Amino acid sequence: ELCITGYTCGDLFFQRSLQVSAENAVKEIAERTENLKALVFIGLPVARTEGIYNCAAVLFEGKLLALYAKSYLPNYGEFYERRQFTPFQQNMETQFISFAGFDDVPFGTDILIQDEKNPYVTVACELCEDLWVPVPPSSRHVLAIGLVQKPNR
């Protein structure tokens, strides 16, 4: 989570230079992993018109496959993510955006990444607090995979 910038940047997350540097880092990591046959998950802030999102970028063979946005932001104890970040609302549809030199990148929570060579392998992502709520994004992922991936027998 937020491995590009670090989790404790506080109000520096509002600085455009930090946001641009994080986006450029994704582009550079994509270029450097072009020959790597592994999914790479990278945490970073993503600035959009409506706010800044705590996200995970997913890379494979030099391509940005998706940007997962965190929905549930902790605001207790030492956590105050709602000060800097906007939650991606459950009722928001997946958007397709341009980011880090890539076009039509899925941005949201309800994103499934399917292996082109093995349709029985499907991956999704959720970030930290999203896992610990009563109905996490992964519950929707599992339901969708069950509906989409049921083998014909």
Regions found by a protein language model. Give the residues of each.
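Enzyme catalytic cores with a strong preference for nitrogen-chemistry domains
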Residues: 1-153
